Amino acid sequence: MAFNLTLLLCDNMLVSSTTLAAEIFYFAQAMDRASNHEVQDVVIRRVTPDGKSVHTSAGFELQATHSLADSFDSDLIHIPALWRNPRPAVSKYEAYIPWLREQHQRNCNFTAVGTGVCKIAIALILLAQP
């Protein structure tokens, strides 16, 4: 059985806030292998609302592997830090909010760094509304 890590991508995100999460999970998997432990595969998905690439604050282009319309499991969803004011990204990526709510209802776990926490906060605030 695989561990499913989903990395949400946004324009103007801090690239290291996403790539570091992927590297940490791959490192943990490598350490398990080196220690001769039973190793759970790590499946990492890079997701955007439409499956298209994003441009990070450092000018890197990151290609998504999936869109929100695709069907896949997530054990952990990682939300990146955004460059400067997160409000424009929250508006531009509004489609993430209902999707995050749905994942929360499926008992998915979340991590977020820096300004990425605002997406979780907005999604959870919306859970309390009818």
Give each language-model segment a name.
Residues 114-116:
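Catalytic nucleophile serine of serine hydrolases
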Residues 1-110, 119-125:
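Extended, subdomain-level signal for the structured scaffold at the beginning of enzyme domains
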Residues 126-130:
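A short alpha->loop->secondary-structure connector
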